[in-house]
Amino acid sequence: MAVVTMKQLLDSGTHFGHQTRRWNPKMKRFIFTDRNGIYIIDLQQTLTFIDKAYEFVKETVAHGGTVLFVGTKKQAQESVAAEATRVGMPYVNQRWLGGMLTNFSTVHKRLQRLKELEAMEQTGGFEGRSKKEILGLTREKNKLERSLGGIRDMAKVPSAIWVVDTNKEHIAVGEARKLGIPVIAILDTNCDPDEVDYPIPGNDDAIRSAALLTKVIASAVAEGLQARAGAGRGDGKPVVEAAEPLAEWEQELLAGATAAAPAEGAVATETTPTEG
């Protein structure tokens, strides 16, 4: 069973790319057409690549790995934090600090400092200090919490990273590639597919698109955790609320995909939807 449907992708606007003047020519193979100066991403390919990424994440986690969720742009911050937290994975949804991966030993020391300050605050360690000292320690704790709170329990570099917007997160992607850490990411029409190991062609600017695809990756993590625990295979299909009706041309895309599918709910991997 497919982990996400064409209808869910269309409802979330995953098929909308950037304006035709803002694109990376390397993305040409993932583009279906353009409409009103906007590139339309081939969602048949998106479905196929989602399956590949889902399987990789599930197997990685099932074998004891961790996935770091990265999305610092406003449209991704909430879903990245919520989905990573849901499955107990680390995340970065504020500013990426250079060296978070390549200089993790230093980052780990800052995490230890954060936990030390939290323990002091909770056990009365601030008592007996001047107001100025308490204010300084509180500010230090809050700053560390903002920048490192999402990775507080990350004891080592992750097995893979999930990225929303590889252009904005180019430092994170570069560090992962330098360390040989696989990158799973949304590829919008202005991105470079050569930087990503497991690409998912799609819209990385729309809140609902970023949320849907992040939820898919989190569901893969959840299924991997179930397998690791010996709980058997779970249903990783994300639940998406009904959206407003599709435009006529979007309905044609959906109809083409349905006709091409070998079975209900399956992913067609060889047929490109036809625009009417």
UniProtKB/Swiss-Prot annotation:
Short name of any one Pfam family annotated for the protein: Ribosomal_S2
UniProt feature, compositional bias: Low complexity: 255-276
HAMAP family assigned to the protein according to its UniProt record, in alphabetical order: Ribosomal_uS2_B
Biological process according to GO: translation
SUPFAM superfamilies documented for this protein: Ribosomal protein S2 (SSF52313)
Entry-linked NCBIfam families: rpsB_bact
Name of the protein described by the UniProt record: Small ribosomal subunit protein uS2
Residues covered by region (Disordered): 254-276
